[in-house]
Amino acid sequence: MPHMSGGATMSPVAGMAGGGGGFGTVLLPGLMAVAIMFSGIAAVALPLAQEFGITREIDDRVMCPLPIAAVAMEKIIFSAIQSVLAAALVFPLAYYIPSTPVLAHVTSWWFLGAVVVLASLLAGALGLTIGTSVQPKQIGLIFGVVIMPITFLGCVYYPWTALTHIRWLQIGVLVNPIVYMSEGLRAALTPTTGHMPEVMILAMLTFFLVLLTWAGMRGFARRVLS
């Protein structure tokens, strides 16, 4: 497989952190994106597997005087809070543990806040969509078959711009919402590394959030009323 550096250097990771630093600089936003994604999905999908199980615990949840959509939205918001806390916990670990220096610098706090909030809500919406789309006993299988591949293709361990020399893959990963989580945090925390345009990141995070929230709420209502 060709080096993502285009063969200009012996190391495929050298030069990714264009403004200095090492692989730790590239990895920091990716690890935070993984923490947000896994925390958000697990906080929604795993409880739903139990609630939609044989005991149908979900029937007790929807007896509250709220619309079904409000119950689904509560799950997304609650998981988003957990995702923000997970990202806050991972940041110091990913910043101080690597042996190579990590060059993190926030140039726009509002952009960082927008990315974290949108990514956290998106992870919860993805968890709701997964939790309402598969049978409870298949949740564990989904983590192995779906979650892990989209993580490795989510620009976690490399910036999206590093895929320039593998053009078909660079275009193909654009359907992966985790790409925009990683790239958004990369643009906010390590702007010296290559990243997508900020406008594109915010637009695609919003698009996937709306799409997955709609799909998740529709699936949640269907499973509750079935």
What positions do the PLM features span?
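Transmembrane helix segments
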Residues: 2-3, 131-175
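Hydrophobic alpha-helical transmembrane segments of multi-pass membrane transport/permease proteins
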Residues: 1-7, 26-40, 146-152, 203-210
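Short helix-capping/hinge motifs at transmembrane helix termini and TM-loop junctions
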Residues: 1-10, 38, 94-106, 132-135, ...
